[in-house]
């Protein structure tokens, strides 16, 4: 699943309440609140995580501050993928990659950080044993087998964070590469053997996540196609029905470089009238105001492409490496306009696909664990040969570079 969200269970293994999604205002101010208990530098040096109000740690801190009775009743916290594994098997464990999204995980020791947990006054007992991606958790319960009239089978903890399963499917042959997992969120980064946690990565607020085979991902979380998805929902509420293809065509026809937004501005996090918020942002920053759907979508796409360049430059500065290709995976690869704009803005070739990267990665981990595929290199080769990839070469870089400056 997506990262950071969780459920609390009581001593009988029952949900205390339904999980609450991270797009909720209860965590406002919790990042600053945490710095009263543990310094920002120490916090980052342990977890190596990008500070974002949505992170699990700040959700738990909000519960402690505002609804402490829930934490007092809780016996176990399970992140969303682990909750499904528990419902299937009855076993309570936490998979490594999803644990690393919580900002409660020691990135170097690859376990829960008692220092962070204790500093923030959170109950240590609710955190379960951490297991690696690819661990066989157990069998599907007899109750489910009887209900569905199926034979027993193994449940394998894949990379529970969807980005990390998607990363398994990146169709590369290189050790050093840049990926862009593009969906509701855009996650741009590189795969490394050990976390990068230093003054520079802290300044850039870059995150380290655990991945398959104990690899680490060094990446930036960027608000992604949420901006278009939520704009589309707003237009539907206004009686304007557009599919994504139509919106892309309207964007192609719109005036280029009319205005830019920072996709990560807090104004765009919550659900609602994103087009109005974009106009408000442009007004406040003394830019031209986008006046129709095409101009809004063009503004979003151009702004995302520029943000990808900005983040790529930060990644390169921290790794001291250059990259020849951006491997773009996920639903966003269906947008030819965004793929081309990404190549243009970053002045780098884009390889687009597979679309269903998370699914491919999920299946590949299970096949590797059951010895049907030899290793990660072979898995990526199979996925590459099973998909029609699209490639985009940079165009008009001088124009994009001028606008970027």
Language model features with spans:
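Short beta-strand-loop/turn "lid" adjacent to the catalytic site in phosphate-handling enzymes
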Residues: 1-21, 50-54, 85-106, 129-132
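Glycine-rich beta-strand-to-loop/alpha-helix junction loops that act as flexible
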Residues: 1-4, 133-134, 182-185, 325-333
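Short, conserved acidic/polar surface loops in the N-terminal third of protein domains
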Residues: 7-12, 32-34, 192
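Structured loop/turn residues at beta-strand edges in well-structured enzyme cores
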Residues: 14, 125, 321
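Carbohydrate-associated surface elements
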Residues: 24
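Active-site core segments that coordinate phosphate-bearing ligands/cofactors
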Residues: 28, 35-48, 52-53, 58-91, ...
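A conserved helix-loop-beta module that forms one wall/lid of the active-site cleft
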Residues: 120-135, 363
């Amino acid at each position: 699943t997506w990262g950071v969200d969780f459920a609390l269970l009581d001593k009988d293994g029952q949900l205390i309440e339904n999980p609450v999604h991270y797009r909720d205002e209860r965590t406002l101010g919790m990042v600053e609140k945490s710095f009263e208990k543990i310094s920002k530098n120490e916090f980052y040096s342990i977890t190596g995580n990008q500070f974002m109000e949505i992170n699990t740690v700040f959700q738990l801190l909000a519960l402690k501050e505002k609804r402490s009775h829930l934490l007092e009743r809780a016996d176990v916290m399970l992140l969303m993928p682990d909750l499904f594994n528990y419902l299937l098997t009855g076993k309570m464990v936490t998979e490594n990659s999803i644990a690393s999204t919580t900002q409660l995980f020691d990135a170097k020791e690859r376990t829960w950080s008692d220092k962070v947990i204790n500093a923030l006054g959170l109950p240590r007992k609710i955190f379960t044993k951490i297991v690696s991606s690819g661990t066989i958790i157990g069998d599907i319960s007899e109750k489910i087998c009887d209900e569905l009239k199926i034979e027993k089978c193994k449940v394998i903890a894949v990379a529970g964070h969807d980005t990390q399963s998607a990363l398994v499917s990146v169709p590369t042959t290189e050790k050093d590469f840049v990926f862009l997992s593009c969906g509701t969120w855009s996650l741009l980064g590189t795969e490394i053997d050990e976390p990068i946690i230093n003054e520079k990565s802290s300044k850039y607020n870059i995150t380290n996540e655990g991945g398959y085979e104990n690899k680490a991902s060094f990446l930036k979380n960027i608000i992604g196609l949420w901006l278009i998805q939520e704009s589309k929902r707003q237009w539907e509420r206004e009686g304007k029905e557009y599919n994504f293809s139509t919106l892309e065509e309207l964007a192609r026809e719109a005036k280029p470089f009319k205005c830019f937004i920072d996709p990560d501005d807090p104004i765009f996090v919550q659900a609602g009238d994103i087009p109005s918020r974009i106009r408000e942002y442009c007004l406040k920053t003394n830019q031209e105001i986008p006046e129709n759907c095409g101009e809004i979508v063009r503004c979003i796409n151009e702004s995302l492409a520029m943000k990808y360049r900005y983040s790529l430059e930060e990644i390169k500065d921290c790794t001291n490496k250059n990259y020849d290709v951006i491997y773009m995976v996920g639903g966003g690869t269906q947008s030819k306009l965004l793929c081309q704009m990404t190549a243009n803005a970053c002045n780098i070739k884009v390889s687009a696909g597979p679309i269903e990267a998370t699914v491919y990665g999920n299946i590949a981990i299970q096949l590797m664990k059951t010895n049907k595929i030899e290793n990660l290199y072979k898995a990526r080769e199979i996925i590459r040969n099973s998909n029609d990839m699209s490639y985009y070469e940079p165009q008009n870089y001088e124009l994009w570079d001028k606008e970027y400056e």
